[in-house]
């Protein structure tokens, strides 16, 4: 979570019930949120995080299985949001990745998401408001699904 601590005023880690033990694996200051209905899909985890965040100018939604994102990428997303972007997402060579930032104007729609597609549909709905932030960071595409992915 150090990746986000440098840039974000608050870092919230959303877990499903029973996964609180991951707290032992995370260093640094963060707030823990349990998404009671996480089994419904990632949309419920996003909603739980937004609810817990409360009042903030923006949120950057990062995925725990993407530890190779560069801190510079997170900084660029935050600066783009500070500049007034509604949605800011990293892009490299025409491909978009994660994490994605959202202006507080979209907190309501983020809490209304359904299923396990994350915010993809919301991004599509607001495509004219999306700022693609060009980065040189392949970590925006690299996720960890198995222990061997860490090498």
Whereabouts are the PLM-identified features?
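Conserved beta-strand segments that form the floor/walls of ligand-binding pockets within enzyme
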Residues: 65, 101, 143
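Phosphate- and divalent-cation-binding pockets in alpha/beta enzyme and binding domains
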Residues: 21-22, 109, 143
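Nucleotide and nucleotide-moiety/phosphate-recognizing core
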Residues: 1-96, 128-135
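A general structural signal for well-ordered alpha-helical segments in protein cores
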Residues: 43-46, 74, 107, 116-120, ...
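Short, glycine-/small-residue-rich phosphate/pyrophosphate-handling segment
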Residues: 2, 95-126
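Pocket-edge positions in alpha/beta enzyme catalytic cores
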Residues: 34-37, 99, 111, 142
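Conserved alpha/beta core of the MobA/IspD/sugar-nucleotide pyrophosphorylase nucleotidyltransferase superfamily
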Residues: 112-151
């Amino acid at each position: 979570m150090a990746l986000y601590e440098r840039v974000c005023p608050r870092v919230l880690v959303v877990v499903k019930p029973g996964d609180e033990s991951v707290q032992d694996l995370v260093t640094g200051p963060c707030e823990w949120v349990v998404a009671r209905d996480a089994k419904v899909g990632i949309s419920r985890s996003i909603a739980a995080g937004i609810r817990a965040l409360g009042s903030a100018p923006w949120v950057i939604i990062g995925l725990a299985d993407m530890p190779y994102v560069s801190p510079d990428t997170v900084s660029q997303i935050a600066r783009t949001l500070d500049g007034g972007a509604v949605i800011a997402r990293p892009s490299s060579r025409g491909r978009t990745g994660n994490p994605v930032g959202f202006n507080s104007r979209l907190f309501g729609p983020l809490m209304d998401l359904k299923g396990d597609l994350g915010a993809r549909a919301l991004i599509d709905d607001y495509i004219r408001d999306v700022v693609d932030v060009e980065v040189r960071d392949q970590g925006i595409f690299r996720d960890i699904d198995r222990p061997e992915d860490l090498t």
